[in-house]
């Protein structure tokens, strides 16, 4: 699970207000993730979230302000958890090694937590709506991901393993666009071979980057 509930009460001691607040928010975010996976955006209401998480609609409204506020929080929590996980695996690496590790990590995360990937795509799709109030969250996450990839490519260029004629920013766009496209096809095609698609993408992308 990308994030867990704060610790339970121990030794009969009551949780602090901050712990209760964090626990309530996490329970409601997890409820929203479950609802988005089962009934979609229309069915993921503050009332439904309150009922599923064991809280009231009033508390959900207090925490998130609105349905859009809830979706912003869901995206932030999923994005932050993924970024933390990826950074731990990268451990400061750069260049071709970092690109390969990141592609493998994306695949492992998708296979382990398909429900979280599905929620991200549901909300990213909804963010295209001109009236969407959480479009900036989706755009910010994607920009951060592209900037990370561009930094790995520049690191590889600095140590001579990546071609100097490669544009880091444009290559990062191709990288992230490729992974989004692969995952999107997987979401809508039950027979789509995700590991094979990732393997091909990894081989081709690294070949395109590698200095000869």
Q: Which sequence ranges carry the predicted segments?
A:
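Amphipathic alpha-helical segments used for helix-helix packing
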Residues: 98, 111-136
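Helix-turn-helix
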Residues: 27, 31, 35-69, 73
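Amphipathic alpha-helical packing segments from all-alpha helical-bundle domains
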Residues: 80-83, 87-88, 112, 132-159, ...
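Hydrophobic/aromatic-rich alpha-helical bundle segments in the mid-to-C-terminal region
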Residues: 117, 135-143, 157-205
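N-terminal intrinsically disordered/low-complexity leader segments
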Residues: 1-23
């Amino acid at each position: 699970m990308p994030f867990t509930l704060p610790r339970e009460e121990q030794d009969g001691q009551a949780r602090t207000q901050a712990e209760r607040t964090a626990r309530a928010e996490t329970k409601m975010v997890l409820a929203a993730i479950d609802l988005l996976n089962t009934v979609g955006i229309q069915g993921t209401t503050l009332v439904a979230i309150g009922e599923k998480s064991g809280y009231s609609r009033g508390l959900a409204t207090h925490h998130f302000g609105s349905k859009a506020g809830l979706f912003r929080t869901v995206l932030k929590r999923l994005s932050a958890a993924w970024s933390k996980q990826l950074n731990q695996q990268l451990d400061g690496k750069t260049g071709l090694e970092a690109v390969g590790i990141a592609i493998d990590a994306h695949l492992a995360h998708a296979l382990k937590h398909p429900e979280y990937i599905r929620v991200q795509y549901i909300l990213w799709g909804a963010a295209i709506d001109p009236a969407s109030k959480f479009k900036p969250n989706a755009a910010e996450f994607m920009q951060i991901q592209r900037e990370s990839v561009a930094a790995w490519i520049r690191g590889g260029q600095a140590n001579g393993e990546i071609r100097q004629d490669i544009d880091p920013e444009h290559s990062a766009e191709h990288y992230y666009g490729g992974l989004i496209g692969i995952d999107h096809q997987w979401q809508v095609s039950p027979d789509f071979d995700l590991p094979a698609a990732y393997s091909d993408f990894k081989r081709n992308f690294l070949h395109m980057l590698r200095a000869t």
